[in-house]
Swiss-Prot record:
GO CC annotations, alphabetized: cytosol
Name of protein: L-fuculose phosphate aldolase
Keyword Secreted belongs to the record: no
GO biological process: arabinose catabolic process; L-fucose catabolic process
């Protein structure tokens, strides 16, 4: 797909992320795999003011085009693509319930079968590191080895998928799961969870069932 169309999709995803209540202000960032690198949102520009020309290209060596400043979190986007060759889009936000669970430094367990949408029987929580650092990107790379989404301790959420629409869908789904988890925790701890065997069945079914979006 040509660059301007991808840039427009990035902007539309950012606006939809805000509309869904997953983000606010200039928090969060969005990227797509492009050529030997990626296209990513810039730093410090409110989503409603973004234009296609603001979207930044970063090559596979981490070098960005002159005259533009990429999101400070570009390193963990790059790490996500390296860790997940099947991913072509990454969405990061500070959704309230995901962030609340991350503050507890807990993974989201298998409280509902939709946990399998992220690729396993839980959604991990990557250890805290200062935003924008290589250390944080290393935590992200490890957490995404066997998952399509991870919480970031005291920070937020990352979701990656085959395209932007699927990545945003997954981010929204994880936020709902986080809300369910916090609601259940208010009643009992530990919470009842599905067994690994039950989640394995769901994972198998998800191979032929789920969100259908043209690539």
């Amino acid at each position: 797909m040509e660059r301007n169309k991808l840039a427009r999709q990035i902007i539309d995803t950012c606006l939809e992320m805000t509309r869904l209540g997953l983000n606010q202000g200039t928090a969060g960032n969005v990227s797509v795999r492009y050529q030997d690198g990626m296209l990513i949102t810039p730093t410090g520009i409110p989503y409603e003011k973004l234009t296609e020309s603001h979207i930044v290209f970063i090559d596979g060596n981490g070098k960005h085009e002159e005259g533009k400043l990429p999101s400070s979190e570009w390193r963990f986007h790059m790490a996500a693509y390296q860790s997940r060759p099947d991913a072509n889009a990454v969405v990061h936000n500070h959704a309230v319930h995901c962030t609340a669970v991350s503050i507890l430094n807990r993974p989201i367990p298998a409280i509902h079968y939709m946990i399998a949408a992220a690729g396993g029987n839980s959604i991990p929580c990557a250890p805290y590191a200062t935003f924008g650092t290589r250390e944080l990107s290393e935590h992200v790379a490890l957490a995404l080895k066997n998952r399509k989404a991870t919480l970031l301790q005291h920070h937020g959420l990352i979701a990656c998928e085959a395209n932007l629409e699927k990545a945003l869908w997954l981010a929204h789904e994880v936020e709902v799961l986080a809300q369910l988890y916090l609601t259940t925790l208010a009643i009992t701890d530990p919470v009842p969870v599905l067994s690994d065997e039950e989640i394995a069945v769901v994972l198998e079914k998800f191979k032929t069932y789920g969100l259908r979006i043209e690539e």
